Amino acid sequence: MEASAPDRARRGWRRARAAASPLSRAAVVLLLSALVLRAPPSVGYLDRLPRSFHLTQESAKIVGSPNFPVKVYVMLHQKSPHVLCVTQRLRNFELVDPSFQWHGPKGKIVSENSTAQVTSTGSLVFQNFEESMSGVYTCFLEYKPTVEEVVKNLQLKYIIYAYREPRYYYQFTARYHAAPCNSIYNISFEKKLLQILSKLVLDLSCEVSLLKSECHRVKMQRAGLQNELFFTFSVSSLDTEKGPKPCAGHSCESSKRLSKAKNLIERFFNQQVEVLGRRAEPLPEIYYIEGTLQMVWINRCFPGYGMNILKHPKCPECCVICSPGTYNSRDGIHCLQCNSSLVFGAKACL
């Protein structure tokens, strides 16, 4: 069977390695640097919807139910939706002389509270929702349906949960033809590659971390032994306030920044193949092996938070604070059962 063009090219590159010039090690560094200079300063966001989404909207209004507690999800450190002290039915009626009173995990809520406010119409609003504010909230409503009728009482319960975006990151693996495994040139190349990748995603408030780097001798099919570097690295998003540039708005979502970083890194490795394919001189001793870049999308929750599509169907990809009776001690995905846990956001089972 006739070999494909990429296979023929790779075999040609391997034969050319034997004739590599003494300057080839320096050439690969220059090659990588040139690729970074060729990379565009910005790449458009993916058109697909982000894996995470915000439930917190200032315009949203949530009504209660007389039959069961209503779940409310508020992103950590963000403003909450308006939690109304009425049912959907009462919202469409006039209420005469209504009186509202809210109680939370720390007792009665007064309108003068700086973090949790009760509006003149009885709505509960949080300006900067903290983890410790998660819990059961109860509203007591007194009203008359009409002036002539007697006072009626209604009690509505809400369970308000803090939630956060998952700790998304991409894990990449890539292979390079290498110098002998005991060569210092491999170590030098590794450092340079990480510097270039880090610079590539710096303006996106993302960081590159090397997870593993190994050198192995590989027996090729119908060929001899060759040295290869196996790189495993991750790309994760930083808090926007920790990045080099201020960021605000919808474009700052970690999933969007990571998608853009992924595109830049994939383009960087593709350009290495393109540049090597156009070279007339012998190949450098260390170079990327076409087709070996692999990527896996990984998400984790912060300690004290977890995902549960059955318990939180309205926020399936959110890391919701662990309820009493559960905990998450590490950056796992789910809250685990712990009967001795009595608080929201438990990070240990004591």
UniProtKB/Swiss-Prot annotation:
* Sites carrying sugar chains: 113, 186, 339
What protein is this chain from? Zona pellucida-binding protein 1
* Tissues expressing this chain: Expressed in testis. Detected in sperm cells.
Query: Mind listing the GO biological process terms from this record?
Result: acrosome assembly; binding of sperm to zona pellucida
User: Which purpose does this protein serve, as stated in its record?
Assistant: Plays a role in acrosome compaction and sperm morphogenesis. Is implicated in sperm-oocyte interaction during fertilization.
Family according to the record: Belongs to the zona pellucida-binding protein Sp38 family.
The protein's predominant localisation is: cytoplasm
Xref: PANTHER family: ZONA PELLUCIDA BINDING PROTEIN SP38 (PTHR15443), ZONA PELLUCIDA-BINDING PROTEIN 1 (PTHR15443:SF5)
Identify the stretch annotated as signal peptide in this record: 1-38
Known post-translational modifications? N-glycosylated.
Q: Which Pfam families match?
A: EGF_Sp38_C, Sp38
The UniProt entry's coiled-coil ranges are none
Give the bilayer topology: Peripheral membrane protein
List localization entries.
Cytoplasmic vesicle, Secretory vesicle, Acrosome; Secreted; Cytoplasmic vesicle, Secretory vesicle, Acrosome membrane
Record keywords: Cytoplasmic vesicle, Glycoprotein, Membrane, Secreted, Signal
User: In the UniProt record, which is one GO cellular component term?
Assistant: acrosomal vesicle
Q: Matching InterPro entries, A to Z?
A: Ig-like_dom_sf (IPR036179), Ig-like_fold (IPR013783), Sp38-bd (IPR010857), ZPBP1/2_C (IPR048805), ZPBP1/2_N (IPR048806)
- The reply to whether Glycoprotein figures as a keyword in the UniProt entry is yes
